[in-house]
């Protein structure tokens, strides 16, 4: 009797277990399952919207009493790589070209270039363009803007794919100083009317120069300046700044970081617009007072860079002079001015 009851109990347990297993399989495979947000630890994340504070633009630097940075601070063969305001100083060996190519190439950037070829300076257009096609921003979209008083003199240099050239007529002036002083105005107006829709970055270069080695995306930045080849190893008291207090380009003996060349500057197109417009307004203020700065637009450029620090600085390998021997501190020359008769060109 006892054994019969035990057998019945075991049978009932087995039947109940089988029924529960079948029921679980049915529920798992046939009944719809829904997940609700409140089972998650942070259900509010689905409706969360971030409200960022508006970006605050950097303000002009007022305090300028600090030691001058020296490009050859360590030893004659080693260049400084960082400014006191943490802007990189670009030179050979400070960047990986292949890595930068992988970073910037997918962005499909368009880089603009402005040059001015007025009067006899039209003779330099061909050598400039041919060297640029060989070395400047290879593999990127490039738009050359040639400002000239003689569009017929612009040669038909073959351009690579995705590389364009626009010849833009401008008025010639009897004095080369006037042409130089009008450059900032012309560039800022061109950006406002056209270039801001066509390019991402804009470099403003001199036409009487040639590229000698690759110039690539290592030069891209918000606002870019190049150190002048004649003053990279001298104290700032010897820089040819405008020293007259009556000029808006005035720089005191205790001010200045590097002396920058007017032949090379650039950056994001919006920043270049602000920069050239600011320089133009300062030039107009001087002109209203009957003043012309010592080195014209270059004096205003240097004054502006003291108060509005460049985000990237190019070493003299990006702005050299063919009349100077290459120093041991520069491993190569990328962009250099040609040896020429200045007095003949400006006559």
Swiss-Prot record:
The chain crosses the membrane at residues 6-26. Substrate binds at residues 116-121, 206-208, 228-231. The gene is GBGT1. The keyword Hydrolase does not apply. The keyword Methyltransferase does not apply. Residues 1-5 are cytoplasmic. This is Globoside alpha-1,3-N-acetylgalactosaminyltransferase 1. It is a single-pass type II membrane protein. Mn(2+) binds at residues 206, 208. The conserved DXD motif is involved in cofactor binding. The manganese ion interacts with the beta-phosphate group of UDP and may also have a role in catalysis. Belongs to the glycosyltransferase 6 family.
């Amino acid at each position: 009797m006892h054994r019969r009851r035990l057998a019945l109990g075991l049978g009932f347990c087995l039947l109940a277990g089988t029924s529960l297993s079948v029921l679980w399989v049915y529920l798992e495979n046939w009944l719809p399952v829904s997940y609700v947000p409140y089972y998650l630890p942070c259900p509010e994340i689905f409706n969360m919207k971030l409200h960022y504070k508006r970006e605050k633009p950097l303000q002009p630097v007022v305090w300028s009493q600090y030691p001058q940075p020296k490009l050859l601070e360590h030893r004659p063969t080693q260049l400084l790589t960082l400014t006191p305001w943490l802007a990189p100083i670009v030179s050979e060996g400070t960047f990986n070209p292949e890595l930068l190519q992988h970073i910037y190439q997918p962005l499909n950037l368009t880089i603009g270039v402005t040059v001015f070829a007025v009067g006899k300076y039209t003779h330099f257009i061909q050598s400039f363009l041919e060297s640029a096609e060989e070395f400047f921003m290879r593999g990127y979209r490039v738009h050359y803007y040639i400002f000239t008083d003689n569009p017929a003199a612009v040669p038909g240099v073959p351009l690579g794919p995705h590389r364009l050239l626009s010849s833009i007529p401008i008025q010639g002036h009897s004095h080369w100083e006037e042409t130089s002083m009008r450059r900032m105005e012309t560039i800022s107006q061109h950006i406002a009317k056209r270039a801001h829709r066509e390019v991402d970055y804009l470099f403003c270069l001199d036409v009487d120069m040639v590229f000698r080695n690759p110039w690539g995306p290592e030069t891209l930045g918000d606002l870019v300046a190049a150190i002048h080849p004649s003053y990279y190893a001298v104290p700032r008291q010897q820089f040819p700044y405008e020293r007259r207090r009556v000029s808006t380009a005035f720089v005191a003996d205790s001010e200045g970081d590097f002396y920058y060349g007017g032949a090379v500057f650039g950056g994001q197109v919006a920043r270049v617009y602000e920069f050239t417009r600011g320089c133009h307004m300062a030039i107009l203020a001087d002109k209203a007072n009957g003043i012309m700065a010592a080195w014209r637009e270059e004096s205003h450029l240097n004054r502006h860079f003291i108060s509005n620090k460049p985000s990237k600085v190019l070493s003299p390998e990006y702005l050299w002079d063919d009349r100077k021997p290459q120093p041991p501190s520069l491993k190569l020359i990328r962009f250099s001015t040609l040896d020429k008769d200045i007095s003949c060109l400006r006559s």
